[in-house]
């Protein structure tokens, strides 16, 4: 029995020497003993509240508590009232190190007590080191080094390092870090506070860092980041995302192999309100003759740097009333130099105006793998992932990128007119400059914003090659397209996407538009010769858009209304001027039976008008069915005018035009031949009769006149042949013969259409006569559908006075006042000239 008691005593002594002991989990008993003057405090407290129904307590001598504090020189034995205390409690072990009253314990830092002797709770080891301002402290981290994370981020293994510094009595957060990074050392002065957070299941039993003594660093801190190969690091200013301490200095030292290149890009930053000094970043770059190089935070940062370099952030004296905050988050990317980095490209924009060129990364899915960055460098030094070049200068750029297909270009140019008297009839070419085409980066968009004075001028686009409108039935298969849309902020109007190789000869638009050349394949470089638009400023017209279409006899033309996916905007009118060659017939086909539009206010109309005869059909789109396929022998208009539709019932129409050769009916030819033969025989018979009568007259002797003075020599009056008076009939009114009936062959245009000039009606000039679209009915009217209604031309001249014997005018439906028609045949008068 004595031997047994001796063994128990030895075992208990061993537990005390270790400082803490844990009994088997079944007993759930723990003992923690802290040596005297160790400056260690252990605190067990409730962690994040859980939804567990049954609470858990710390049990000491049958007392149930929720928090336990153990100080130096104390020994406590305790248990938990539950089987899973890690779900309820956390443990903090804090060691205070005072370097101001005695020597500092420099070297590797140990975990005390050992994690193997502590309860299986989430653990936080804290080292709080206080030192003089003149003493620098350096935290050295063993491999794997640290990686800084931002707010809301977490470490994959749950192990985090929280590091803080001190400015007088104020604690400053340097940052939160995970394992597997590039941060190897952090230097501070006036003290440091290091917290290591370990999850309850993690087996780690070493701190992973050491403390060294250094001279004063004369700044808040210095963070060293070491790159052994290609990689990237994201770093943040102190207190991020809150404000950087006022008038402080923080430095990052980067160790980069000489054969690699480093580039810096700012991901996020804010500036405070400075009273004195200026917030800035300073670089110490190897080989630079101007070290340190000073940049503003909004400047493009250096890139393509070889070897080690330093980056410092300098604050300022802030405004006491409105200080604002200074903060910075940036990324350093290290990679091998690329061949393109040694090649300089010249982009000459000195002759351009109101133009900007942006080179930027394509949108890609994020990957956890390291991907070498793509940078574009200005003058080989200022590098960033985005670079914007402006007009008026000549620029030299190079690329630091392993794959240039990861970049693309977007260009914007504004062509505006402020004085309509100067701009009218002026033309501008919309072409991509050759300097841009020669760059090794693919062009994505080239946008021209075309601006005109409101209600003064309109625009016309004429392509180098006729355009095809992109539709689902006939998509564009070229390497680029033109996207035409309104440039008025309050107007949602997209005319469509167009590519070369179609039948659209020109596009007229009423007001400001944006024309965007968008490429879809690298082959655009080979097809660049096909691109080219000419824009001209023309007199103002009220149509939102007019498309001039000259269909090809070999293919079907598909056309659709603007805003196909959203519907034609309210109260918008668009027209298509469709030319039909003389020897062709056009078939107009709509692809659905009804338009589907439901008008909230007003009416939606479609007008199909023959340009030669002015015959037109008017359809109410919100009531009528769309017309069935119709054939047109001459050029014609299609006009579509929208109402204010209800939500979800928008107006969108798709139609096609197909040309076929014109054929003549054999029956018509036979009838014409027979009729011609009859007329010829009748003419021959009439000629024979006239010849015979003439011969009879020549056989008679000369006539002898005898004077008789009892005979009245006055010519007798013409007896009345009309029972009505002059006022009762239109005998004095002659119908005017239309010019097109007499001079029709002189009024035909190149496409065979008749151009009928308008008379006695003033309209603003809208181009060549006959190119004006039909005017839609009043939007709020309820006019029924009119079929083939020939337009009556207005009178050609003012009405004549009633005293004139003859009047040339159009038929008048009004009453004609009665006048005497008895006029002596030998006393006739010449008609008077019409009054001007």
From Swiss-Prot:
On whether Secreted is a keyword of this UniProt record, the answer is yes
Q: What ranges are annotated Cytoplasmic (topological domains)?
A: 689-836
Cellular compartments per GO CC: extracellular region; plasma membrane
Q: Which UniProt keywords apply?
A: Cell membrane, Disulfide bond, Glycoprotein, Membrane, Phosphoprotein, Secreted, Signal, Transmembrane, Transmembrane helix
Phosphotyrosine PTM sites in chain numbering: 734
Please give the start and end residues of each transmembrane region.
668-688
User: What binding partners and quaternary form does the record give?
Assistant: Interacts with CDH2/N-cadherin, CDH3/P-cadherin, SDC1/syndecan-1, SDC4/syndecan-4 and the serine protease ST14/MT-SP1. Also interacts with SRC and PRKCG/protein kinase C gamma.
Extract the ranges annotated as region (Disordered).
776-836
Q: How is it modified after translation?
A: Phosphorylated on tyrosine by kinases of the SRC family such as SRC and YES as well as by the protein kinase C gamma/PRKCG. Dephosphorylated by phosphotyrosine phosphatases. Also phosphorylated by suramin, a heparin analog. Tyrosine phosphorylated in response to dissociation of integrin alpha-6 beta-4 from laminin-5.
Q: What is this protein called?
A: CUB domain-containing protein 1
Q: In which tissues is it expressed?
A: Highly expressed in mitotic cells with low expression during interphase. Detected at highest levels in skeletal muscle and colon with lower levels in kidney, small intestine, placenta and lung. Up-regulated in a number of human tumor cell lines, as well as in colorectal cancer, breast carcinoma and lung cancer. Also expressed in cells with phenotypes reminiscent of mesenchymal stem cells and neural stem cells.
Endpoints of the signal sequence: 1-29
Q: Mind telling me which residues the site (Cleavage) is annotated on?
A: 368-369
Q: Which residues are glycosylated?
A: 39, 122, 180, 205, 270, 310, 386
Query: What organism is the protein native to?
Result: Homo sapiens
CUB domain location is 417-544
Q: Which residues lie on this side of the membrane: Extracellular?
A: 30-667
Function in brief? May be involved in cell adhesion and cell matrix association. May play a role in the regulation of anchorage versus migration or proliferation versus differentiation via its phosphorylation. May be a novel marker for leukemia diagnosis and for immature hematopoietic stem cell subsets. Belongs to the tetraspanin web involved in tumor progression and metastasis.
Q: Which cysteines are joined by disulfide bonds?
A: 476-499
């Amino acid at each position: 029995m004595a031997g047994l008691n001796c063994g128990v005593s030895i075992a208990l002594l061993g537990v005390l020497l270790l400082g803490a002991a844990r009994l088997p989990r079944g007993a759930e008993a723990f003992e923690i003993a802290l040596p005297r003057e160790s400056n260690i405090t252990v605190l067990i407290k409730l962690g994040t509240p859980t939804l567990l129904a049954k609470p858990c307590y710390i049990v000491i001598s049958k007392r149930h508590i929720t928090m336990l504090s153990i100080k130096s020189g104390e020994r406590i034995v305790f248990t938990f009232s539950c089987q899973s205390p890690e779900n309820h409690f956390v443990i903090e072990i804090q060691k205070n190190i005072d370097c101001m009253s005695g020597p500092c314990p420099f070297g590797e830092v140990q975990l005390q007590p050992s994690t193997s002797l502590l309860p299986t709770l989430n653990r936080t080891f804290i080292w709080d080191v206080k030192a003089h301002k003149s003493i620098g402290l350096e935290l050295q981290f063993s491999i794997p080094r640290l990686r800084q994370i931002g707010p809301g981020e977490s470490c994959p293994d749950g192990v985090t390092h929280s590091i803080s510094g001190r400015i007088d009595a104020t604690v400053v957060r340097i940052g939160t870090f995970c394992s597997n990074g590039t941060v190897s050392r952090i230097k501070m002065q006036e003290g440091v506070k290091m917290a290591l957070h370990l999850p309850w299941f993690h087996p780690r039993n070493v701190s992973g860092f050491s403390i060294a003594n250094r001279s004063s660093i004369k700044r808040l801190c210095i963070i060293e980041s070491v790159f052994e190969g290609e990689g990237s690091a994201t770093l943040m200013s102190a207190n991020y995302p809150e404000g950087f301490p006022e008038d402080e200095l923080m430095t990052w030292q980067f160790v980069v192999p000489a054969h690699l290149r480093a580039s810096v890009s700012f991901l996020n930053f804010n500036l405070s309100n400075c009273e004195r000094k200026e917030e800035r970043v300073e670089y110490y770059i190897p080989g630079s003759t101007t070290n340190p190089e000073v940049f503003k935070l909004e400047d493009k940062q250096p890139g393509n740097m070889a070897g080690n370099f330093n980056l410092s952030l300098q604050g300022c004296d802030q405004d006491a009333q409105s200080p604002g905050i200074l903060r910075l988050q940036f990324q350093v990317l290290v990679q091998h130099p690329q061949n393109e980095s040694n090649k300089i490209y010249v982009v000459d924009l000195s002759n351009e105006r109101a133009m900007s060129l942006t080179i930027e990364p394509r949108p890609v899915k994020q990957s956890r793998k390291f991907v070498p960055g793509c940078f574009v460098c200005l003058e080989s030094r200022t590098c960033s992932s985005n670079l914007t070049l402006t007009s008026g200068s000549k620029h030299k750029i190079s690329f630091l990128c392993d794959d240039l297909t990861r970049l693309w270009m977007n260009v914007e140019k504004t062509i505006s007119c402020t004085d309509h008297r100067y701009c009218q009839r002026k033309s501008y070419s919309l072409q991509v400059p050759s300097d841009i085409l020669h760059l090794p980066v693919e062009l994505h968009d080239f946008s021209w914003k075309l601006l005109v004075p409101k209600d003064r001028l309109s625009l016309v686009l004429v392509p180098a090659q006729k355009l095809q409108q992109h539709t689902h039935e006939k998509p564009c298969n070229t390497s680029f397209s033109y996207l035409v849309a309104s440039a008025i902020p309050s107007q949602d109007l997209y005319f469509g996407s167009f590519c070369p190789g179609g039948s659209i000869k020109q596009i007229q638009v009423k007001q400001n538009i944006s024309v965007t050349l968008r490429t879809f394949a690298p082959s655009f470089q080979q097809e660049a010769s096909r691109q080219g638009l000419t824009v001209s400023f023309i007199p103002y017209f009220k149509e939102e858009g007019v498309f001039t279409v000259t269909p090809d006899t070999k293919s079907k033309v598909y056309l659709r209304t603007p805003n196909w996916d959203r519907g034609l905007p309210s109260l918008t009118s668009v027209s298509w001027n469709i030319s039909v060659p003389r020897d062709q017939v056009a078939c107009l086909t709509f692809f659905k039976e009804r338009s589907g539009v439901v008008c909230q206010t007003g009416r939606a109309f479609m007008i199909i008008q023959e340009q030669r005869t002015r015959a037109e059909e008017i359809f109410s789109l919100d009531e009528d069915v769309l017309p069935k396929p119709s054939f047109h022998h001459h050029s014609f208009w299609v006009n579509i005018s929208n109402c204010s539709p209800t939500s979800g019932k928008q107006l969108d129409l798709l139609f096609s035009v197909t040309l076929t050769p014109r054929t003549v009916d054999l029956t018509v030819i036979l009838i014409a031949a027979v009729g011609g033969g009859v007329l010829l025989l009748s003419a021959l018979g009439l000629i024979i009769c006239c010849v015979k009568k003439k011969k009879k007259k020549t056989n008679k002797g000369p006539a002898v006149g005898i004077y008789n003075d009892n005979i009245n020599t006055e010519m007798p009056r013409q007896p009345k042949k009309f029972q009505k008076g002059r006022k009762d009939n239109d005998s004095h009114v002659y119908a005017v013969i239309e010019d097109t009936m007499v001079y029709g062959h002189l009024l035909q245009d190149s496409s065979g259409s008749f151009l009928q000039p308008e008379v006695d009606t003033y309209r603003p000039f809208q181009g060549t006569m006959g190119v004006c679209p039909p005017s839609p009915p009043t939007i709020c009217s309820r006019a029924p559908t009119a079929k083939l209604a020939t337009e009556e031309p207005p009178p050609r001249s003012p009405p004549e006075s009633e005293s004139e014997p003859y009047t040339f005018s159009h038929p008048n439906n009004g009453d004609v006042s009665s006048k005497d028609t008895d006029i002596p045949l030998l006393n006739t008068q010449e008609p008077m000239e019409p009054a001007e």
